[in-house]
From Swiss-Prot:
Subcellular location: Periplasm
Keywords, sorted A to Z: Electron transport, Heme, Iron, Metal-binding, Periplasm, Signal, Transport
GO MF term list: electron transfer activity; heme binding; iron ion binding
Cellular component annotations (GO), alphabetically ordered: periplasmic space
Record: residues binding heme c 1: 34, 37-38, 86
InterPro entries assigned to the protein according to its UniProt record, in alphabetical order: Cyt_c-like_dom (IPR009056), Cyt_c-like_dom_sf (IPR036909), Cytochrome_c4-like (IPR024167), Cytochrome_c_Oxidase_Subunit (IPR050597)
A Pfam family recorded for this sequence: Cytochrom_C
KW Ribonucleoprotein (keyword) present: no
Gene giving rise to this polypeptide: cc4
Record function comment: Diheme, high potential cytochrome c believed to be an intermediate electron donor to terminal oxidation systems.
Protein name, UniProt field: Cytochrome c4
Signal peptide: 1-20
Amino acid sequence: MNKVLVSLLLTLGITGMAHAAGDAEAGQGKVAVCGACHGVDGNSPAPNFPKLAGQGERYLLKQLQDIKAGSTPGAPEGVGRKVLEMTGMLDPLSDQDLEDIAAYFSSQKGSVGYADPALAKQGEKLFRGGKLDQGMPACTGCHAPNGVGNDLAGFPKLGGQHAAYTAKQLTDFREGNRTNDGDTMIMRGVAAKLSNKDIEALSSYIQGLH
C-alpha cells in the first residue's frame, strides 16, 4: 500500500466517521417504514434500493445523517446527500433514532448475491487491481478483498450489494450527483476513471462477492 493511500485511509478514518452508539434492540422498533423498501431485516428485495443488513454501523449512521441534512427543505447545494425517495422520511427522527436504526440494520445478516459470469472477470480485475496507469487504486484498499469494508474507518461493506444500486452510486459519484465522500473526494476520483462498461462489470462482480 503506497504512502498516498495510507495517508488517505488515515484521513478518512479519523475525520470521515460518524459516532455510532446505537441500540440495535431499540432500533428494531423504529424501522417499520424502512422495511417497505429495504426489507424488514435490511435485505432489500428491490434491486434499486440498497441492502442495509450487515452494513457497517458507522457508515450507515453517516449516510442517515447526510440524507437527513441533504433532504431538509432549502438545504444548500452540496450539503449532505440528496436521495429523492428519502425526502422528508428522516425529518421526525432524532439523532438517537438514527443511531439505533443504524445499529439494528448493522446487526442483521446480509444475503448473498450472484455475479453475471460474463462480467465477473473484468469486474474482478477492476476490484482487485484498479487502473493504476490512470491513478485509480484497487477497491480492496478500502473495502477489503472480500468486500466486507472497514467499519472502524467508515468504509462500507460492498459484497452482496445489488448491482443496480452500486452502478447508480458509481455513476452518481462520476457525474457529481453524489458528493458526500468527504473533502478528499476519493469516490468521485475513482468513479471518474470508470466507463459505463467498467461500472457494469464492477457492480456485477461486487454483487456476487462474499
